[in-house]
């Protein structure tokens, strides 16, 4: 018999049998060795063949092991192992059986038949476990499905559906799929397309996260519940596993062979299987090498003839990019568009999924949490889709709470640390013999006793609460299993079992759960097991940086005192500070228009009066950092072509992938202060872009993504009309001054731009009385730098006034003050520090001598 006539699987098993015999120190390869390796073979035919006729494969394997142990062992055979006469006889009989069946190659299942026909140990074991020639012959025919073994890889293609697909209907029967709520219209349209005679292949198209895969799972659940038309009853929904299909396909044509095996198996099922291909676009080009055919082209004939019932799912972008380009493939599919559900629909979906997440995280999810997850995610997470983003919020909030429940509560942790600290001190004091130490030791022992008692009481309480939570968890799991059993009994028509579960088991478990939940809600002092809207808001704030959580009292006070906080850094300019403060308060109180930025302001006024400083102060107030603002110098956008830098280059231009300067900054930090400095210096086309931002709080970047500006404060600064402010200051009141300046502004900016700004604020020029306060603020920064080097500096009032006088210039505002500080204070200080006249550690006073500021120690 020629070994090249064996199938690949049979050849591999023979090689394994040889190493098996070698490992057991047997001189010959016996039929038992070969049967043992065939039984252990991954993806082999023997195990499923024996299982199909009711033979326990584990018991059979044990019998073979015992027979192997009884074989004679020969030490030092040096790797020369030969097939025994018995094995050669068995293989010759396999060859005979293959020729009889009309096969070109000998497959491994014929070896079982040959073993039963021959006499020997293997034949006896097979008969002992219940194998007969008739049973095996029938099982082989069933396994082959009337096909001949015409190539060496024939065994690999068998059971292709089992290997390369996941049975969704089976998972639905076992209750492993999440419930599908709503989506009736899409499921109905999918069923309608599946009912067609030809081209009965729907493709679900929608944005990522809208629930395309869930629709197919919903279809599987409807099929097992019998809630489908006659044509779809008792059908199976199988999901194609592209990873398994491609994995390990090393040689050219191996992938195609596997896919062909799947298609052949599907053809044999005669329309009883609906194949679901998730990420359908991966089929286009899958397995394509030079000149080879890709998976998409192999599917086309089966799809066109209606032999293959297929449901695809892909996103809009990928459908356009891959499927639409292949018109022949596109026409074989019928599009079913899956839109994003509304907030109300999302709330219904979340209510349906609630129990699954409660069971997984061992927490209770309240209804306000569900409503908050849907509404807040819809408002604040703009780059993802419902219901996916809302489900993620619930999931993460549950995980966060579970993590807190599993770790030690903070109060207990604090007590434990204190006990350890006291014990360490106790050990140290025991070594001392003086009276003070003894007295301290007595006090310490008393405190330690109290703390240890407190700790043990608290620990008991914690353990009791944890046990109560675990109790409800077990009941919930039992209830879930009872409901799955009820569904299975209903489908199989077992009325006795149904009534037993429905009227006996479930009401009892529900009573237990109600009692346990009541007991749980009474005492919970250390553990929180409820996901509320506060937890959802907290998770969202962590994701986006947008403060949507309920305001703490401290934050409310801070917002009410916002003007005083800003005035610590910005001197004068009451109108500007009030306008900004009111906008932020409106936003945090939830009264601002949700479809516009928090506030948009145009700051007008001469240079050096605090326009940019107010923006920095606002960023510091909101985010505790001056750098937490997006600052764009509009003088960089003077040319028409520079405008594209804000939103990103259009397709085909260099830098298209990088995104825009403004849009990328806001995508990363949706809650920020945007400062457009010196806005009048920008090209007029920039204002066309800003119109959308100011009116709708949105902007589309170069790649077509919508960027959300609804949680930003947009501030533009300009020097327009500053000469008029300088001239008329003092002679006109604020409103008259503002009218004159706005007249100049309206000549430079278009009316539609000015009309969209919340408020234009005119800054006053700074007077002498303001300069002393500004000088003090700027000196504080210098003191901080000196403090790091060990110098404590103070300034007298007289010196401060001289400094303010030196830095006063009505035209340039507060900027000359910086130069005055450098010349009058920093330069002399630097010289004295370097020469050693000022020593660290001693206080330094800045005073006046001969009309000059001097540093003394």
From Swiss-Prot:
First-listed, main subcellular location of the protein, grouped into a coarse class: cytoplasm
| Renumbered residue ranges of the record's region Repeat 2 | 83-146
What ranges does the record give for the region C-terminal, renumbered to this chain? 766-857
Compartments where located? Cytoplasm
| Domain of life per record | Bacteria
Chain segments carrying region Repeat 1: 6-71
Summarize the protein's role. Answer: Part of a stress-induced multi-chaperone system, it is involved in the recovery of the cell from heat-induced damage, in cooperation with DnaK, DnaJ and GrpE. Acts before DnaK, in the processing of protein aggregates. Protein binding stimulates the ATPase activity; ATP hydrolysis unfolds the denatured protein aggregates, which probably helps expose new hydrophobic binding sites on the surface of ClpB-bound aggregates, contributing to the solubilization and refolding of denatured protein aggregates by DnaK.
* Family that this chain belongs to: Belongs to the ClpA/ClpB family.
Oligomer and partners: Homohexamer. The oligomerization is ATP-dependent.
Output the NCBIfam families linked to this UniProt entry.
Answer: chaperone_ClpB, PRK10865.1
For this entry, the protein name equals Chaperone protein ClpB
Q: Which organism is it from?
A: Photorhabdus laumondii subsp. laumondii (strain DSM 15139 / CIP 105565 / TT01) (Photorhabdus luminescens subsp. laumondii)
At the highest ranks, the source species' classification is:
Bacteria, Pseudomonadati, Pseudomonadota, Gammaproteobacteria, Enterobacterales
Designated gene of the protein: clpB
């Amino acid at each position: 018999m020629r070994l090249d006539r064996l199938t690949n699987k049979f050849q591999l098993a023979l090689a394994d049998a040889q190493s098996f015999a070698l490992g057991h120190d047997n001189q010959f390869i016996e039929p038992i060795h070969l049967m043992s390796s065939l039984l252990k073979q991954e993806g082999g035919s023997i195990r499923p063949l024996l299982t199909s006729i009711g033979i326990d494969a584990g018991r059979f394997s044990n019998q073979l092991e015992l027979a192997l142990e009884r074989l004679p062992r020969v030490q030092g055979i040096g790797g020369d192992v030969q097939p025994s006469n018995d094995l050669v006889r068995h293989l010759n009989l396999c060859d005979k059986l293959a020729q009889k069946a009309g096969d070109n190659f000998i497959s491994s299942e014929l070896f079982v038949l040959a073993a039963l026909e021959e006499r020997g140990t293997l034949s006896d074991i097979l008969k002992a476990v219940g194998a007969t020639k008739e049973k095996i012959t029938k099982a082989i025919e069933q396994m082959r499905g009337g096909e001949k073994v015409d190539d060496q890889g024939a065994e690999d293609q068998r059971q292709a559906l089992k290997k390369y697909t996941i049975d969704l209907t089976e998972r639905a029967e076992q209750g492993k799929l999440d419930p599908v709520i709503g989506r009736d219209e899409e499921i109905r349209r999918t069923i309608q397309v599946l009912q067609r005679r030809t081209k009965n292949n729907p493709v679900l198209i929608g944005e990522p996260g809208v629930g395309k895969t869930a629709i197919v799972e919903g279809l599987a659940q409807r099929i097992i519940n019998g809630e489908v038309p006659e044509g779809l009853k008792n059908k199976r929904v199988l999901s194609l596993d592209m990873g398994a299909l491609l994995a390990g396909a090393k040689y050219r044509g191996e992938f195609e062979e596997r896919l062909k095996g799947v298609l052949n198996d599907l053809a044999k099922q005669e329309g009883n299987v609906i194949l679901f291909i998730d990420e359908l676009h991966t089929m286009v080009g899958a397995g394509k090498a030079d000149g080879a055919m890709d998976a998409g082209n192999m599917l086309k004939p089966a799809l066109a003839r209606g032999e293959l019932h297929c449901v695809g799912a892909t996103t809009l972008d990928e459908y356009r990019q891959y499927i639409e380009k292949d018109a022949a493939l596109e026409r074989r599919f019928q599009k079913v568009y899956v839109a994003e559900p509304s907030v109300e629909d999302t709330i219904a979906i979340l209510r349906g999924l609630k129990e699954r997440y409660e069971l997984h995280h061992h927490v209770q999810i309240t209804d306000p949490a569900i409503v908050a997850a849907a509404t807040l995610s819809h408002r604040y997470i703009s780059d993802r889709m419902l219901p996916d983003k809302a489900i993620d919020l619930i999931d993460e909030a549950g995980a966060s709470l579970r993590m807190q429940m599993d770790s030690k509560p903070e109060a207990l942790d604090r007590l434990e640390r204190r006990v350890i600290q006291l014990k360490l001190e106790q050990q140290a004091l025991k070594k001392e013999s003086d009276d003070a130490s003894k007295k301290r030791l007595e006090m310490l022992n008393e405190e330690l006793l109290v703390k240890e008692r407190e700790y043990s009481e608290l620990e008991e309480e914690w353990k009791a609460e944890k046990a109560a939570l675990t109790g409800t968890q077990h009941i919930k799991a039992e209830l879930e299993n009872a409901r799955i059993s009820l569904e299975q009994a209903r489908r199989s028509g077992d009325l006795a079992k149904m009534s037993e579960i429905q009227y006996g088991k479930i009401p009892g478990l529900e009573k237990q759960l109600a009692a346990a939940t009541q007991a749980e809600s009474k005492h919970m002092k250390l553990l929180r097991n409820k996901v509320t809207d506060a937890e959802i808001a907290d998770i969202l704030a962590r994701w986006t940086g947008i403060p949507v959580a309920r305001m703490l009292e401290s934050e409310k006070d801070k917002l009410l005192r916002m003007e005083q906080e800003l005035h610590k850094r910005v001197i004068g300019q009451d109108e500007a500070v009030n306008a900004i403060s009111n906008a932020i308060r409106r936003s945090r109180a939830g009264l601002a228009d949700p479809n516009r930025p928090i506030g948009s302001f145009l700051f007008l006024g001469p240079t050096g009066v605090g326009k940019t400083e107010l923006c920095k102060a606002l960023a510091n107030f909101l985010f505790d950092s001056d750098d937490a603002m997006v600052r764009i110098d509009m003088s960089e956008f003077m040319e028409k072509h520079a405008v594209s830098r804000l939103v990103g280059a259009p397709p085909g231009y260099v830098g298209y992938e990088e995104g825009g300067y403004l849009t990328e900054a806001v995508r990363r930090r949706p809650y920020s202060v945007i400062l457009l400095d010196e806005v009048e210096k920008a090209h007029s086309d920039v204002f066309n872009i800003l119109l959308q931002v100011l009116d709708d709080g949105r902007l589309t970047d170069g790649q077509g993504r919508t960027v959300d500006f609804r949680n930003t404060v947009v501030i533009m600064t300009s020097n327009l009309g500053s000469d008029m402010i300088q001239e008329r200051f003092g002679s006109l009141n604020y409103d008259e001054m503002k009218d004159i300046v706005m007249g100049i502004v309206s000549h430079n900016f278009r009316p539609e731009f000015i009309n969209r700004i919340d408020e234009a604020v005119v800054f006053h020029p700074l007077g002498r009385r303001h300069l002393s306060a500004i000088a003090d603020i700027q000196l504080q920064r210098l003191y901080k730098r000196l403090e790091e080097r060990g110098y404590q500096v103070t300034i007298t009032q007289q010196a401060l006034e001289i400094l303010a006088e030196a830095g006063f210039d009505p035209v340039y505002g507060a900027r000359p003050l910086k130069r005055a500080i450098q010349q009058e204070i920093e330069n002399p200080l630097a010289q004295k520090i370097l020469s050693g006249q000022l020593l660290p550690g001693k206080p330094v006073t800045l005073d006046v001598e001969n009309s000059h500021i001097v540093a003394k120690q």
